[in-house]
Swiss-Prot record:
Primary gene name: aroA
InterPro entries associated with the record: Enolpyruvate_Tfrase_dom, Enolpyruvate_Tfrase_sf, EPSP_synthase, EPSP_synthase_CS, RNA3'P_cycl/enolpyr_Trfase_a/b
Catalytic activity from the UniProt record: 3-phosphoshikimate + phosphoenolpyruvate = 5-O-(1-carboxyvinyl)-3-phosphoshikimate + phosphate
Positions contributing to phosphoenolpyruvate binding: K28, G101, R129, Q177, R359, R402
GO cellular component terms given for this protein: cytoplasm
Annotated spans, Disordered: 1-20
Descriptive protein name: 3-phosphoshikimate 1-carboxyvinyltransferase
Pathway field: Metabolic intermediate biosynthesis; chorismate biosynthesis; chorismate from D-erythrose 4-phosphate and phosphoenolpyruvate: step 6/7
Pfam families xref list: EPSP_synthase
Annotated family: Belongs to the EPSP synthase family.
Enzyme Commission designation: 2.5.1.19
Organism: Bradyrhizobium sp. (strain ORS 278)
Length: 445
């Protein structure tokens, strides 16, 4: 099981204007998928811009344990020589994913289609998170959990199917992790595996499967949903992948630039996939100055340069159907809402309760301890913005990287400094967050 070092607290203080040009790390979702699909392909895959955070490095390690050759060839440059669909070897060691729910759940899907048995584990936070929603459809395809902690949680042993069965599966919630696990298992099944979702979730797996040569067709389902049909047993071919900057990581310097007076900050190569840009849409509705140029793409994923300038924000209502496109960004959106004038209502946030922490309660606690009026009603978060934040609070991060970064952003414009109890877990997704923000003008001490 993963362990962490002693806590490393940090104080964030009111800063002068943020400026310059920065590139946030490569997208975490793309990085995980590039490693996994590279490992399931025949031949070599070259990846540039890979996120070298702990979560992704644990996925790289798991691919090595399962028989793929994974090497770092330069800064953020990696090669993967795969074993082909269904070719994973029996692992000699536990697959430890640390804090990464995405890596763990996607690899469960990939393992489910192979006739091997693997032990999955993670840190205390990941051990507390639900896995049943992933394991249920994989069981329909022939995989079996032969041992697990109470409630199907980690650590658990997954026996992959000798003869995986294609299924048609309707996801109970909008979840790219559930969808992706089923599709990755479906690669090894004969015939067509279909996933139906009522609300479209991020489509990185579908786009990358096409990039590696899979036959996959996506059609509309209802007013907001999608039907994804994958033809199994393809021969995936290694392909080059350029990883764009992660919009979920870009969210932190972006919101910081909006709330710190006089800021004018440029973020380069940010992914602008429409299923990941709910935060940008919401902030623009609040009055944010966010401009895009240098628009281009790779492997089906669009990216652009963003110019962000300090803005006077107003409260808005965020509809629940927007949640899948910004599920990881509500924490830092709540910070923006605290600096806005008026009330912001974020609806339908039930999925925040089963992230690295109960992010709904943790977000409310982060705001309250710093003098912001906030209320949770059911699955809705209501923030009363007053144009400024008193600050002065100590924020409990609960081993959650996004809580830590959101609180540090909040302190950059608050009346009194904001302190986080531990910054260690920031390394899971954004290892250079603190030096990169300092370079732009942030005052962390």
């Amino acid at each position: 099981m993963s362990t962490s070092a002693a806590p490393t607290p940090l104080e964030s203080r009111a800063s002068g204007p943020l400026s310059g040009t920065i590139r946030v790390p490569g997208d975490k979702s793309i990085s995980h998928r590039a490693l996994i699909l590279g490992a399931l392909s025949v031949g070599g895959t070259r990846i540039s811009g890979l996120l070298e955070g702990e979560d992704v490095l644990n996925t790289a390690k798991s691919m090595r344990t399962l028989g793929a050759k994974v090497e770092r060839t330069g800064e953020f440059a990696w090669t993967v020589n795969g074993v082909g669909v269904g070719g994973f070897a029996q692992p000699a060691a536990t697959l430890d994913f640390g804090n990464s729910g995405t890596g763990c759940r996607l690899v469960m899907g990939a393992v489910a289609g192979c006739p091997i048995s693997a032990v999955f584990d993670g840190d205390a936070s990941l051990r507390s998170r639900p896995m049943r929603r992933i394991l249920d459809p994989l069981a329909l395809m022939g995989a079996k959990v032969t041992a697990s902690a109470e409630g199907g949680k980690l650590p658990l042993t997954l026996q992959g199917a000798s003869n995986p069965v294609p299924i048609e599966y309707r996801t109970p919630v909008a979840s790219a992790q559930i969808k992706s696990a089923v599709l990755l298992a479906g690669l090894a099944a004969p015939g067509v595996t279909t996933v139906i979702e009522q609300e479209a979730s991020r489509d990185h797996t579908e786009l990358m499967l096409k990039h590696f040569g899979a036959e996959i067709v996506t059609t509309p389902e209802g007013s907001h949903g999608r039907r994804i049909a994958l033809t199994g047993q393809p021969e995936l071919r290694g392909a080059p992948v350029i990883v764009p900057a992660d919009p979920s990581s870009a969210a932190f310097p972006l919101v910081a630039a909006l709330i710190v007076d006089g800021s004018d900050l440029v973020l380069s190569d940010v992914m602008t996939n429409p299923l990941r840009t709910g935060l940008f849409t919401t902030l623009r509705e609040m009055g944010a100055s966010i401009e895009e140029d240098d628009v281009r793409g790779d492997a089906g994923e669009p990216m652009a340069r963003l110019r962000v300038r300090a803005s006077k924000l107003k409260g808005v209502e965020v509809p629940p159907e927007r949640a899948p496109s910004m599920i990881d960004e509500y924490l830092v959106l709540a910070v923006a809402a605290a600096y806005a004038e008026g009330t912001t209502i974020m609806r339908g946030l039930h999925e925040l309760r089963v992230k690295e922490s109960d992010r709904l309660e943790a977000t409310a606690a982060m705001l309250r301890v710093n003098g912001v009026k906030v209320e949770i009603t059911g699955d809705d978060l209501i923030v009363e913005g007053r144009g400024h934040v008193p600050g002065g609070g100590l924020v409990a991060t609960h081993m959650d990287h996004r809580i830590a970064m959101s609180a540090l952003v909040m302190g950059l414009a608050s009346d009194k400094p904001v302190t986080v109890d531990d910054t260690a877990f920031i390394a899971t997704s954004f290892p250079d967050f603190i030096p990169l923000m300092r370079k732009a003008g942030a005052d962390f001490a």
